[in-house]
């Protein structure tokens, strides 16, 4: 597992606390905007990052937990990760739908 990259600040206009979860120089982004990005228990944020050289799935403990790479190998479709209510992670790679049970990692 990698260290936390978390930082936060308060928005001066609204007073809301803003969390920045990644600080790596590579591109990192959320899942597709219609899909949940948090695990069912709201403790982990799932995101896509290119920090491993291609689009891969990562998770970060929220708000200040470590970052862990979930997928490896051939690049995933960058906006495909989806989390089911039971915590199973679905994604697209090479035109096929794949699943990962994070509990078995």
Where are the predicted features?
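Blade/loop signatures of beta-propeller domains
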Residues: 1-19
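Beta-rich carbohydrate-recognition and catalytic domains
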Residues: 4, 95, 100-105
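Predominantly a core beta-strand signature of beta-propeller blades
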Residues: 6, 17-18, 65-69, 104-105
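Hydrophobic/aromatic beta-strand positions that recur at structurally equivalent sites within the blades
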Residues: 10, 60, 100-103
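Surface-exposed loop and turn segments in beta-propeller and other repeat-based domains
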Residues: 19-28
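Blade-loop segments of beta-propeller domains
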Residues: 27, 32-34, 54-97
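N-terminal low-complexity or amphipathic/hydrophobic leaders
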Residues: 33-42
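Residue position within the beta-strands of beta-propeller blades
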Residues: 44-48, 90-92
């Amino acid at each position: 597992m990698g260290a936390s990259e978390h930082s936060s600040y308060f928005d001066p206009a609204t007073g809301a606390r803003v969390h920045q979860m990644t600080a790596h120089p590579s591109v990192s982004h959320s899942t597709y905007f219609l899909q949940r990005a948090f695990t069912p228990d709201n403790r982990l944020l799932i995101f896509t990052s290119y920090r491993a050289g291609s689009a891969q799935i990562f998770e970060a403990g929220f708000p200040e937990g470590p970052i862990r790479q979930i997928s490896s190998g051939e690049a995933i479709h960058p906006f495909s990760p989806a989390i089911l209510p039971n915590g199973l992670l679905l994604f697209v790679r090479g035109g096929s739908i794949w699943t990962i049970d994070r509990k078995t990692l």
